[in-house]
Amino acid sequence: MHLDVWGARGSHPASGMAFSRFGHHTACLSVRSGDHLLVLDAGTGATALARALEPNPPRVVEILLSHFHHDHVMGLPYLLMSLPAETELRIHASPEGALGLETLVAAILSPPYFPAGIAGVLGRTDCRQHAAGAAFEAGALDIRTHPLEHPGGSTAFRVSDGARSFVYATDLEEPEQPDPAWIAFARGADLLVHDTMFTEAEREVRRGWGHATIEGALQLADAADVARLVGFHHNPVHDDQVMFQREQELARRRPGSGLAREGEALRI
């Protein structure tokens, strides 16, 4: 099993050559399992995924949305409209608030947020809303969920093929005290993809924004005995020079760890 990185930025895309080594697009990852494609978030990176799928589209696409902030759903219409009509489409999420999943997806695919013309896509999309902490299957993959501390809520996913597993945990503010349930959720994962958006100094002035630091990611990885840690949801103002410095610090403290790069495949 390997995890393809189509976008690793947070909040908004980065622009310019100074950001090219770690990438410009916002959150989108994917993993193939037989004739299923599992997509984790659909930020602007989903547009790159859509282009890559054109020669060999999967029979089933299942999309896990951590939450509905723009940087995680901006590419959703482009991905959905790029797929053949015979592709089975499923979207899984645990949105907070009164609006249900189907209502939120319909809004993203409709005016005034998106031009008319893809209403048929919604009609063939199976929107599956799950309670926080739910477990379900996506083809041969087992999915577990865990609620995260983030404005408006967010969801972490643990994905397993029966032999290997990874945890995708973005848009969370690390707890002040160790959370046994959160540690248990990540326990023994082969790969932890974790929000590392803020430096410690940035976090001090942005408490409550719902993002984590390298320190917070390291604490979870160590407490949960995770095999490998990869930082994600990169600050869009952190250029390659800053990113290399942060990655070196992460690798120094936990050898084998790194920061996600757009276009790479993470072996699990």
Show which residues each predicted segment covers.
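Binuclear metal-dependent hydrolase catalytic cores
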Residues: 1-167, 182-183, 241-268
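DG-centered beta-turn motif at the end of beta-strands
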Residues: 169-171
